[in-house]
Amino acid sequence: LYKVTAFEGMKMTLEGLKSRGVKLAVLSNKPHEATALAIKGLFGEQMFDVVWGLRPGMKRKPAPDNAWKIAEELQVQPKDCMYIGDTNTDMQTGKAAGMYTVGVLWGFRDRKELEENHADVIIEKPEEILRIQEGRACSS
């Protein structure tokens, strides 16, 4: 199993989004079983509406297909979604899917990589997601 921990402020931010009616999803290139187990262990079963890890037959990110499928499952338009991530692959996936991309600096990569991959905005703390969401139509 992958060793993962929740970044400081992440749980509070997710709870804040959930309280606003925002639908939350995870899309990972890690195997589905490991992804689902990690998310459940960190946040419980009710935080995310959809959790997808890589399964046989799925295209890997940065292909936008799975981001589109998740948006469809959640009954939201891609243009109304924020795709939040810390890598070039995340920014490429979100852009290809037509989503608003939020690059985060608390992950594995640096500002330069996120800028080079055209993040719409780059943030330093999870709480900043709440302010961004206030100005966007991300809930339905």
Residue map of PLM features:
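Glycine-rich phosphate-binding loop signature in dinucleotide/nucleotide-binding domains
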Residues: 19-22, 74-80, 136-138
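Acidic, Mg2+-coordinating phosphoryl-transfer loop and its flanking beta/alpha structural elements
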Residues: 82-124
